């Protein structure tokens, strides 16, 4: 009985932590990723257009810059403008997690933490990218993260609709997606 209460308490805590995030029962879906993914063409600056809210992003003007390091890994620099006007940034590293599917990357921001999936589901390299990440939690449920990215601060609505259609056709829930405010933003990088 005590173990069941502990498990239920842990689940309640995880649900509270995942508030606003896409929390679902069952295992992560396995959508197809971008075919013939070219990492070198993907490098550079991307602006966040829409996302499923995540606890670690609190600001607006969110952007990411990907660059190749000497060791062949990818430097990831994420930046946002906080409500108080200060810039928050975090640097991490991305590596290929599946050699046969180069669009499946793993991203790590802290040494002792495991890599998080970073799957590029679709990109044309010049305008848009659709990124999906999903983590299974104790084999009972999963938490989705989705980012629609653009090389510019705004994407045409038909492009956003096209990318959301990819998600829904793979049974990925988009209900909690929100716009990222990119108005009057500085270029951080």
UniProtKB/Swiss-Prot annotation:
One of its GO terms (cellular component) is dendrite. Pfam families: Lipocalin. GO terms for molecular function: cholesterol binding. SUPFAM superfamilies: Lipocalins (SSF50814). Keywords: Disulfide bond, Glycoprotein, Lipid-binding, Pyrrolidone carboxylic acid, Secreted, Signal, Transport. It is found in: Secreted. Residues 1-20 form the signal peptide. The modification Pyrrolidone carboxylic acid is found at residue 21. One of its GO terms (biological process) is negative regulation of cytokine production involved in inflammatory response. Glycans are attached at residues 65, 98. Disulfide bonds join 28-134, 61-185. Homodimer. APOD occurs in the macromolecular complex with lecithin-transport and binding of bilin. Appears to be able to transport a variety of ligands in a number of different contexts. Belongs to the calycin superfamily. Lipocalin family. This is Apolipoprotein D.
């Amino acid at each position: 009985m005590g173990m069941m209460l502990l498990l239920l308490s842990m689940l309640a805590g995880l649900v509270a932590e995942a508030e606003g995030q896409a929390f679902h029962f069952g295992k992560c879906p396995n959508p197809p990723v971008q075919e013939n993914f070219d990492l070198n063409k993907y490098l550079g600056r991307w602006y966040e257009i829409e996302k499923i809210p995540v606890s670690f992003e609190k600001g607006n003007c969110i952007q990411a810059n990907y660059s190749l390091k000497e060791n062949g890994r990818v430097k990831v620099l994420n930046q946002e403008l906080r409500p108080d006007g200060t810039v928050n940034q975090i640097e991490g590293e991305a590596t290929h997690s599946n050699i046969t599917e180069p669009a499946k990357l793993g991203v790590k921001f802290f040494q002792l933490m495991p890599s998080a999936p970073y799957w590029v589901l679709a990109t044309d390299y010049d305008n848009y990218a659709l990124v999906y990440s999903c983590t299974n939690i104790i084999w009972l449920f999963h938490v989705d993260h989705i980012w629609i990215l653009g090389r510019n601060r705004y994407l045409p609505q038909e492009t956003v609709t096209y990318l959301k259609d990819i998600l829904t056709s793979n049974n990925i829930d988009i209900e909690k997606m929100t716009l990222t405010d990119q108005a009057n933003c500085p270029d951080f990088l």
